[in-house]
Amino acid sequence: MQLSRWLFSTNHKDIGTLYLIFGAWAGMVGTAMSVIIRAELAQPGSLLNDDQIYNVVVTAHALVMIFFMVMPIMIGGFGNWLIPLMIGAPDMAFPRMNNMSFWLIPPSFILLLASAGVESGAGTGWTIYPPLSSNIAHAGGSVDLAIFSLHLAGASSILASINFITTIINMRTPGMSFDRLPLFVWSVFVTAFLLLLSLPVLAGAITMLLTDRNINTTFFDPAGGGDPILFQHLFWFFGHPEVYILILPGFGMISHVIAHYSGKREPFGYLGMVYAMIAIGVLGFLVWAHHMFTVGMDVDTRAYFTAATMIIAVPTGIKVFSWMATLQGSNLQWETPLLWALGFVFLFTLGGLTGIVLANSSIDVVLHDTYYVVAHFHYVLSMGAVFAIFAGFTHWFPLFCGYNLHPLWGKAHFFMMFVGVNLTFFPQHFLGLAGMPRRYSDYPDAYTLWNTVSSIGSTISLVAMLFFIFLIWEAFASQREGVTPEFANASLEWQYNSFPPSHHTFDETPSTVVIVK
């Protein structure tokens, strides 16, 4: 009975739980890989004694964190759990397709780990650029397995996106018009469109790479009239929207958390927040070549991509200042989720500022492929997306489980993590400005100090992760009853009559839900 409940589930809460548990496991795998990277770089000289293995670990770390940690947790976990509850729907529009979306992910994960484990592994970086990923530089099955892994993960995301879009358009409760949709629902709605439009391009690119490797096509081989730069354009046309896919649901969750602990019914400038997310989604498709400033583009092309990239800072700024306006003058409840949200706003903004620096093509030519870029995207991912996940998890944990996390130890975990990630990634700005390149397993002695500091920071983050596992155990062991949060009157997900809401949210489909604004 239990086996069929979890294997053949058509229930959005069960599938959301599966996604959250899977994402937690994948997150531990990805964290372990990052600790291997930082152990190698903790001091000059070699630990692994093999640059290929080092690059395999770097590649797997990136792909695991993106496709098997952030996306399953944010979109699959929080999306499945919260969106039907927030819009007053009995479940998702296509419950069985929802189940398939989840069960495509573990085989995809196994294929990725297999790609790292067979032959000499895929040491291409997560971008899989040819000719390094061609059958000459990477003979054997590793890259092919990675390609199949991405195909499965992509198929899963496309199915999930269709499901979310259909659910949000068709299954809102009466009175829940689009201009009253909770911001998290809006964020997943926009994210689903980004996935739907960008993933097929990635699928095309990696399929062409597969045929280049195995049946002698020359899409990316100049010898047959192909061009490796074509792959970069296709990949980044997916890859740039992808980074917004990773952060947009986080924006939605942070909006809920900040409004909630400010004692507000909604964030400041609700409609502006919605338009800002849509604008970020649209602009995200128009800036992909800023990842390619060093491949030799015309100066006018570079001018366009520099300008377009900087324009994205405008809607992002609207969001940041609206969050700050929500906090302004309110009686804050200093609980753990708010700490994560404030940490998010501060550190995401810092990461955004280094992004503005990198948008300048003339500067980027110097900083491209240095640790400055690594520092930039880890500030927006490791302290943006991950902090948003922790904010959302600590906020909605009572809703999901009916129990409360330990309030004091939850705060302790936040401060431990805050120190760890900042100590890890802030020094990398210095390394990048000093010219230390990415994806190398060793470095000149001059870079020793900040690498050592960075590796100490990663050890602190590792301890924080172990402490978080203990926190979850402690919550289930102590069984402190969850109570309706004080300011939950504006959020539909807290209005159901039990924590967690019953397996089937409604005994009968509700006819009306009155929403007072």
Swiss-Prot record:
One GO cellular component term noted in the UniProt record for this chain: mitochondrial inner membrane
Binding site for Ca(2+): E40, G45
Residues given in the record as Fe(II)-heme a binding sites: H61, H378
Binding-site list for heme a3: H376
Record flagged with keyword Magnesium: yes
Enzyme class: translocase
Membrane topology: Multi-pass membrane protein
Stated name of the protein: Cytochrome c oxidase subunit 1
Taxonomy of the source species: Eukaryota, Metazoa, Echinodermata, Eleutherozoa, Echinozoa
